[in-house]
């Protein structure tokens, strides 16, 4: 039987990847109810963003793939580095 995977992607989130990885490592491998409870009570800046992303992935699984919500778990979650803003410090360079 083929396993079905639902995914969600958050782009252009202005949180440091190192800080977001601390939160993501807490929910890897957990079922959805546990992951949502962990993210709700985690006092980190990245927690609400990752909770919103998790809820989006759950909605994709339930609505698009017709999967049972109670059987869902976090199979894979990762954080990569996004774009950087180019800054300039105006100063004489000669």
UniProtKB/Swiss-Prot annotation:
GO terms for cellular component: cytosolic large ribosomal subunit. GO terms for biological process: translation. One of its GO terms (molecular function) is structural constituent of ribosome. Keywords: Ribonucleoprotein, Ribosomal protein, RNA-binding, rRNA-binding. This protein binds specifically to 23S rRNA; its binding is stimulated by other ribosomal proteins, e.g. L4, L17, and L20. It is important during the early stages of 50S assembly. It makes multiple contacts with different domains of the 23S rRNA in the assembled 50S subunit and ribosome. The globular domain of the protein is located near the polypeptide exit tunnel on the outside of the subunit, while an extended beta-hairpin is found that lines the wall of the exit tunnel in the center of the 70S ribosome. Belongs to the universal ribosomal protein uL22 family. Part of the 50S ribosomal subunit. This is Large ribosomal subunit protein uL22. It comes from Tomato big bud phytoplasma. The gene is rplV.
């Amino acid at each position: 039987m083929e396993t079905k995977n639902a995914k969600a992607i958050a782009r252009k989130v202005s949180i440091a990847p190192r800080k977001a990885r601390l939160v993501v490592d807490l929910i890897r491998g957990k079922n959805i109810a546990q992951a949502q409870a962990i993210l709700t009570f985690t006092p980190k800046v990245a927690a609400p963003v990752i909770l919103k992303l998790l809820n989006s992935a759950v909605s994709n699984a339930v609505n698009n793939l017709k999967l049972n919500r109670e059987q869902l778990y976090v199979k894979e979650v990762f954080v990569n580095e996004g774009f950087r803003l180019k800054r300039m410090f105006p100063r004489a360079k000669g």
